[in-house]
UniProtKB/Swiss-Prot annotation:
KW Cell wall biogenesis/degradation (keyword) present: no
Segments forming domain Barwin: 78-199
Cleaved signal peptide residues: 1-25
CDD domains, per database record: ChtBD1_GH19_hevein (cd06921), DPBB_barwin-like (cd22777)
Protein's gene: WIN1
Highest taxon in the source lineage: Eukaryota
Example GO biological process: defense response to fungus
Keywords assigned: Chitin-binding, Disulfide bond, Signal
Disulphide linkage map: 28-43, 37-49, 42-56, 62-66
Domain Chitin-binding type-1: 26-68
Pfam families listed in its UniProt record: Barwin, Chitin_bind_1
Annotated protein name in UniProt: Wound-induced protein WIN1
Induction summary: By wounding.
Length: 200
Protein backbone atom coordinates (compact mmCIF):
# COMPACT_ATOMS: atom_id res chain seq x y z
CA UNK A 1 0.00 0.00 0.00
CA UNK A 2 2.82 2.39 0.88
CA UNK A 3 4.55 1.67 -2.43
CA UNK A 4 1.30 2.39 -4.34
CA UNK A 5 0.89 5.76 -2.62
CA UNK A 6 4.52 6.58 -3.29
CA UNK A 7 4.19 5.80 -7.02
CA UNK A 8 0.94 7.77 -7.22
CA UNK A 9 2.57 10.74 -5.53
CA UNK A 10 5.47 10.66 -7.99
CA UNK A 11 3.14 10.44 -10.99
CA UNK A 12 0.99 13.28 -9.67
CA UNK A 13 4.09 15.42 -9.07
CA UNK A 14 5.34 14.78 -12.62
CA UNK A 15 1.93 15.60 -14.05
CA UNK A 16 1.73 18.91 -12.14
CA UNK A 17 5.29 19.80 -13.14
CA UNK A 18 4.44 19.20 -16.81
CA UNK A 19 1.36 21.41 -16.60
CA UNK A 20 3.37 24.18 -14.93
CA UNK A 21 6.04 23.98 -17.65
CA UNK A 22 3.43 24.24 -20.40
CA UNK A 23 1.72 27.15 -18.67
CA UNK A 24 5.04 29.02 -18.41
CA UNK A 25 6.06 28.38 -22.05
CA UNK A 26 6.40 31.57 -24.04
CA UNK A 27 5.56 31.85 -27.74
CA UNK A 28 7.54 34.04 -30.12
CA UNK A 29 8.44 34.75 -33.74
CA UNK A 30 6.05 34.58 -36.67
CA UNK A 31 3.71 32.41 -34.60
CA UNK A 32 3.26 35.36 -32.21
CA UNK A 33 3.42 38.37 -34.54
CA UNK A 34 7.22 38.71 -34.46
CA UNK A 35 7.46 38.77 -30.64
CA UNK A 36 10.87 38.27 -29.07
CA UNK A 37 11.56 36.02 -26.10
CA UNK A 38 12.19 37.63 -22.73
CA UNK A 39 15.46 37.07 -20.92
CA UNK A 40 17.46 37.00 -24.19
CA UNK A 41 16.18 33.50 -24.97
CA UNK A 42 16.19 32.20 -28.54
CA UNK A 43 13.01 31.64 -30.56
CA UNK A 44 12.77 28.18 -32.15
CA UNK A 45 11.45 27.40 -35.62
CA UNK A 46 8.19 26.38 -33.95
CA UNK A 47 7.79 29.67 -32.07
CA UNK A 48 8.85 28.64 -28.55
CA UNK A 49 11.49 30.28 -26.33
CA UNK A 50 14.52 28.42 -25.03
CA UNK A 51 18.30 28.39 -24.69
CA UNK A 52 19.42 24.99 -25.97
CA UNK A 53 20.76 24.27 -29.48
CA UNK A 54 17.31 23.02 -30.52
CA UNK A 55 16.02 26.58 -29.95
CA UNK A 56 19.10 28.67 -30.78
CA UNK A 57 20.83 27.04 -33.73
CA UNK A 58 20.21 28.60 -37.16
CA UNK A 59 20.51 25.09 -38.64
CA UNK A 60 17.50 24.11 -36.51
CA UNK A 61 15.45 27.02 -37.91
CA UNK A 62 15.93 29.48 -35.04
CA UNK A 63 13.92 32.67 -35.74
CA UNK A 64 15.50 35.29 -33.44
CA UNK A 65 18.31 35.84 -30.95
CA UNK A 66 20.02 32.82 -32.47
CA UNK A 67 23.58 31.78 -31.80
CA UNK A 68 26.02 29.71 -33.77
CA UNK A 69 26.44 27.17 -30.99
CA UNK A 70 23.17 27.33 -29.09
CA UNK A 71 24.61 29.33 -26.19
CA UNK A 72 22.93 32.23 -24.44
CA UNK A 73 24.71 35.18 -26.11
CA UNK A 74 22.25 36.76 -28.55
CA UNK A 75 23.41 37.71 -32.03
CA UNK A 76 21.44 39.61 -34.63
CA UNK A 77 19.33 36.96 -36.29
CA UNK A 78 15.99 36.11 -37.78
CA UNK A 79 14.81 36.21 -41.34
CA UNK A 80 11.72 36.34 -43.49
CA UNK A 81 10.96 35.51 -47.09
CA UNK A 82 8.70 37.10 -49.69
CA UNK A 83 8.20 40.34 -47.80
CA UNK A 84 6.81 43.50 -49.41
CA UNK A 85 9.31 46.37 -49.63
CA UNK A 86 8.12 49.83 -50.61
CA UNK A 87 10.24 52.98 -50.70
CA UNK A 88 10.41 56.20 -48.71
CA UNK A 89 12.21 59.36 -49.78
CA UNK A 90 14.63 59.80 -46.87
CA UNK A 91 17.49 60.91 -49.16
CA UNK A 92 19.87 61.01 -46.17
CA UNK A 93 22.71 62.34 -48.32
CA UNK A 94 20.66 65.54 -48.83
CA UNK A 95 20.16 66.16 -45.09
CA UNK A 96 23.63 65.33 -43.79
CA UNK A 97 22.53 61.86 -42.64
CA UNK A 98 20.49 63.58 -39.90
CA UNK A 99 17.83 61.27 -38.46
CA UNK A 100 16.04 64.21 -36.82
CA UNK A 101 15.69 65.97 -40.19
CA UNK A 102 13.60 63.09 -41.54
CA UNK A 103 11.68 62.54 -38.27
CA UNK A 104 12.88 58.94 -38.06
CA UNK A 105 11.45 56.99 -35.14
CA UNK A 106 14.94 55.85 -34.07
CA UNK A 107 16.30 59.40 -33.89
CA UNK A 108 15.50 59.43 -30.15
CA UNK A 109 18.24 56.84 -29.60
CA UNK A 110 20.46 57.07 -32.68
CA UNK A 111 20.54 60.71 -33.86
CA UNK A 112 23.74 61.41 -31.92
CA UNK A 113 25.62 58.40 -33.27
CA UNK A 114 28.78 59.32 -35.21
CA UNK A 115 28.30 60.38 -38.82
CA UNK A 116 30.28 57.33 -39.95
CA UNK A 117 27.73 55.10 -38.16
CA UNK A 118 24.74 56.90 -39.70
CA UNK A 119 26.07 56.74 -43.26
CA UNK A 120 27.65 53.28 -43.17
CA UNK A 121 24.50 51.66 -44.65
CA UNK A 122 21.40 52.74 -46.52
CA UNK A 123 18.34 53.38 -44.36
CA UNK A 124 15.10 51.50 -43.95
CA UNK A 125 11.95 51.51 -41.89
CA UNK A 126 11.12 48.09 -40.46
CA UNK A 127 7.82 46.37 -39.69
CA UNK A 128 8.59 42.90 -40.97
CA UNK A 129 6.96 39.68 -39.77
CA UNK A 130 10.10 38.42 -37.96
CA UNK A 131 12.39 40.46 -35.74
CA UNK A 132 12.39 43.01 -32.95
CA UNK A 133 9.93 45.91 -32.90
CA UNK A 134 10.12 49.52 -31.78
CA UNK A 135 13.28 50.65 -30.01
CA UNK A 136 14.71 47.11 -30.05
CA UNK A 137 14.92 47.23 -33.85
CA UNK A 138 16.70 50.59 -34.04
CA UNK A 139 20.22 50.43 -35.41
CA UNK A 140 19.96 46.76 -36.41
CA UNK A 141 21.11 45.73 -39.87
CA UNK A 142 19.39 43.61 -42.51
CA UNK A 143 20.71 41.94 -45.63
CA UNK A 144 17.90 42.53 -48.13
CA UNK A 145 17.63 40.46 -51.32
CA UNK A 146 15.37 41.18 -54.29
CA UNK A 147 13.70 37.80 -54.89
CA UNK A 148 13.25 38.52 -58.60
CA UNK A 149 16.85 39.44 -59.47
CA UNK A 150 18.96 38.27 -56.54
CA UNK A 151 20.40 41.78 -56.06
CA UNK A 152 21.15 42.43 -52.42
CA UNK A 153 22.44 45.07 -50.02
CA UNK A 154 22.74 45.72 -46.30
CA UNK A 155 20.58 48.39 -44.68
CA UNK A 156 20.24 49.88 -41.20
CA UNK A 157 16.88 50.19 -39.44
CA UNK A 158 16.18 53.84 -38.59
CA UNK A 159 12.38 54.03 -38.62
CA UNK A 160 9.10 52.15 -38.21
CA UNK A 161 6.51 51.45 -40.90
CA UNK A 162 3.07 49.92 -41.23
CA UNK A 163 3.18 47.96 -44.50
CA UNK A 164 4.09 44.64 -42.86
CA UNK A 165 7.57 44.60 -44.39
CA UNK A 166 10.20 47.22 -45.19
CA UNK A 167 10.09 50.82 -46.34
CA UNK A 168 13.51 51.25 -47.94
CA UNK A 169 15.15 54.58 -48.66
CA UNK A 170 14.51 55.29 -52.34
CA UNK A 171 18.26 55.05 -53.10
CA UNK A 172 18.45 51.56 -51.60
CA UNK A 173 15.26 50.56 -53.40
CA UNK A 174 16.77 51.63 -56.74
CA UNK A 175 20.05 49.85 -55.94
CA UNK A 176 18.37 46.43 -55.69
CA UNK A 177 15.64 47.10 -58.28
CA UNK A 178 18.08 46.13 -61.02
CA UNK A 179 15.41 45.26 -63.59
CA UNK A 180 13.07 48.20 -62.88
CA UNK A 181 10.15 45.92 -62.04
CA UNK A 182 9.90 47.27 -58.48
CA UNK A 183 9.63 50.83 -59.75
CA UNK A 184 6.95 49.74 -62.21
CA UNK A 185 4.92 47.94 -59.51
CA UNK A 186 5.66 50.40 -56.71
CA UNK A 187 7.16 47.68 -54.51
CA UNK A 188 9.61 44.81 -54.44
CA UNK A 189 9.29 41.34 -52.96
CA UNK A 190 12.38 40.70 -50.84
CA UNK A 191 13.92 38.31 -48.37
CA UNK A 192 15.66 39.76 -45.35
CA UNK A 193 18.11 38.40 -42.81
CA UNK A 194 19.30 40.16 -39.65
CA UNK A 195 23.09 40.49 -39.85
CA UNK A 196 25.86 41.91 -37.70
CA UNK A 197 26.42 45.58 -38.56
CA UNK A 198 30.10 45.27 -37.72
CA UNK A 199 30.01 48.50 -35.68
CA UNK A 200 31.98 47.25 -32.66
Amino acid sequence: MVKLISNSTILLSLFLFSIAAIANAQQCGRQKGGALCSGNLCCSQFGWCGSTPEFCSPSQGCQSRCTGTGGSTPTPSGSAQNVRATYHIYNPQNVGWDLNAVSAYCSTWDANKPLSWRKKYGWTAFCGPVGPRGRDSCGKCLRVTNTRTGAQTTVRIVDQCSNGGLDLDVNVFRQIDTDGNGNHQGHLIVNYQFVDCGDN
